Amino acid sequence: MPVRAQRIQHVMQDTIINFYSTSDDYGDFSNFAAWPIKVDGKTWPTSEHYFQAQKFLDEKYREEIRRVSSPMVAARMGRNRSKPLRKNWESVKEQVMRKALRAKFEQHAELRALLLATAPAKLVEHTENDAYWGDGGNGKGKNRLGYLLMELREQLAIEK
């Protein structure tokens, strides 16, 4: 690799790409971004709709979440604790997110290209609203969404 290419590679490795709002430069990485996904024969308006619905075993309630008008409403319904969460939710939530992300980035070529073009930058869901999926706003959160996107980016690059 030429020296200049090595320098560019090094700069990109140190690059952090923050995303959160759908209006951000990389807002399409947000689960709230309006990219429909088809999973198990059903079309979901956003990956957020799909993810929130999977918290519940009640098929009728899952369908209600699928049909709501916005990902914000879907997220609110996902926090409804008057409905019982599936017992294994904590152990399967990352698997569910992986499935949603894979569907989103496989089914939309332009999104896949955008994700692949970010390599090898670190992807960070930058928000103080979430210290599990995001960075907690201060960098101390787990940033699991960012890490799952980087994992998917690696897989898609290999499959290319």
Curated annotation (Swiss-Prot):
> CDD domains, from UniProt?
NADAR (cd15457)
Q: Which domain of life is it from?
A: Bacteria
Reactions listed under catalytic activity? 2,5-diamino-6-hydroxy-4-(5-phosphoribosylamino)-pyrimidine + H2O = 2,5,6-triamino-4-hydroxypyrimidine + D-ribose 5-phosphate; 5-amino-6-(5-phospho-D-ribosylamino)uracil + H2O = 5,6-diaminouracil + D-ribose 5-phosphate
- Pfam families referenced in this protein's UniProt entry, alphabetically: NADAR
Which molecular function terms from Gene Ontology are attached?
A: hydrolase activity, acting on glycosyl bonds
Keywords, sorted A to Z = Glycosidase, Hydrolase
The family line of this record is: Belongs to the YbiA family.
Its biological purpose is as follows: Catalyzes the hydrolysis of the N-glycosidic bond in the first two intermediates of riboflavin biosynthesis, which are highly reactive metabolites, yielding relatively innocuous products. Thus, can divert a surplus of harmful intermediates into relatively harmless products and pre-empt the damage these intermediates would otherwise do. Helps maintain flavin levels. May act on other substrates in vivo. Has no activity against GTP, nucleoside monophosphates or ADP-ribose. Is Required for swarming motility.
Which protein are we looking at?
N-glycosidase YbiA
